[in-house]
């Protein structure tokens, strides 16, 4: 007679590798912050001497502003993730600082799309005169981009209004009410969609630009063509930085969001998605170091031209 009984082993609580989340990632953000502040400071000082006489310049200046504001949120994340700040700082990061980070990241992404559209018109269809190429139109469009991103993001601040249950283990989603969790999920889908739409536009527009430059180069070797090629080479470097920095994060973002808002994910899956999201988000943050290099290079060419 078999008297043995089987019992399921108790579920192990989810644990995080504190070496990764509290030491390595904060340290890397420190490096990105210091480098970004220096490079954006130099870039801003150089670039804002360039008159806002072209749509392209206006869009680049907005990217400089967005990168600078995004960089200002890094110290809060470093102190929060490393456990050096009080629990109130963690709440501030979840409610405010992280939202500001994402607003400025997607503002930058939107302006990358507008830059590609502007370059397409200037290089591929130079004889077409359109209102979209006017400076005033570009300024209005810039304001609309900022307003749209704020309208999508600010509810994440307002709806993150629940009291803290455990100051030793504060979870972002626990601070949101029911509507806040739904808005968080929906707004993330919208933001990710914005990225992939911009990515598609960049691909289409720059393929057309490459074809135009190649055909022009075959027909003529005049200086104007050389100038166009040099200008476009600078833009391609910006696009390369865009893809390298932002694409990995937006591949990882949707699975991570689903793991936050849906209950059927295992502990191991949640942790894997968390680490993937954090490292790819760090890569996106590193864009604040790459943009100033490309932008300053372009500004110096404008001064010489």
Swiss-Prot record:
Residue positions the entry lists as glycosylated: 3, 161
Annotated keywords: Cell membrane, G-protein coupled receptor, Glycoprotein, Membrane, Receptor, Transducer, Transmembrane, Transmembrane helix
GO biological process assignments: G protein-coupled receptor signaling pathway; hematopoietic stem cell homeostasis; immune response
Organism from which the protein derives: Rattus norvegicus
Annotated function: Receptor for UDP-glucose coupled to G-proteins.
A GO term, aspect molecular function: G protein-coupled purinergic nucleotide receptor activity
Localization per Swiss-Prot or TrEMBL: Cell membrane
Domain of life where this protein originates: Eukaryota
Protein family (similarity comment): Belongs to the G-protein coupled receptor 1 family.
Protein name: P2Y purinoceptor 14
TM spans (from-to): 30-50, 56-76, 97-117, 140-160, 189-209, 235-255, 279-299
Residue spans, topological domain Cytoplasmic: 51-55, 118-139, 210-234, 300-305
Membrane topology: Multi-pass membrane protein
Gene Ontology CC: plasma membrane
């Amino acid at each position: 007679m078999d008297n043995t009984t089987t019992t399921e082993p108790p579920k192990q609580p989810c644990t995080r590798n504190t070496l990764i989340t509290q030491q390595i990632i904060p340290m890397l953000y420190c490096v990105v912050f210091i480098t970004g502040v220096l490079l954006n400071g130099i870039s801003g000082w150089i670039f804002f001497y360039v008159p806002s006489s072209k749509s392209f310049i206006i869009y680049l200046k907005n990217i400089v502003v967005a990168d600078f504001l995004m960089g200002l949120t890094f110290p809060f994340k470093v102190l929060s993730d490393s456990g050096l700040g009080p629990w109130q700082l963690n709440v501030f990061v979840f409610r405010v600082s992280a939202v500001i980070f994402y607003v400025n990241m997607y503002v930058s992404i939107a302006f990358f799309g507008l830059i590609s559209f502007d370059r397409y018109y200037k290089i591929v269809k130079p004889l077409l005169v359109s209102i979209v190429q006017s400076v005033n139109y570009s300024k209005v469009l810039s304001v609309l981009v900022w307003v749209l991103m704020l309208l999508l993001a600010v509810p994440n601040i307002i709806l993150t209004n629940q009291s803290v249950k455990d100051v030793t283990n504060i979870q972002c989603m626990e601070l949101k009410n029911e509507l806040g969790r739904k808005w968080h999920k929906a707004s993330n889908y919208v933001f990710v969609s914005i990225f992939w739409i911009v990515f598609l536009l960049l691909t289409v527009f720059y393929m057309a630009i490459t074809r135009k430059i190649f055909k022009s180069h075959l027909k003529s070797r005049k200086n104007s063509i050389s100038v166009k090629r040099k200008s476009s080479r600078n833009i391609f470097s910006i696009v390369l930085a865009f893809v390298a920095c932002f694409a990995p994060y937006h591949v990882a973002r949707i699975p991570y969001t689903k793991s936050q808002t849906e209950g059927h994910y295992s502990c191991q899956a949640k942790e894997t998605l968390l680490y993937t999201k954090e490292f790819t988000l760090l890569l996106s943050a590193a864009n604040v170091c790459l943009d100033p290099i490309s932008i300053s290079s372009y500004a110096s060419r404008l001064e010489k031209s």
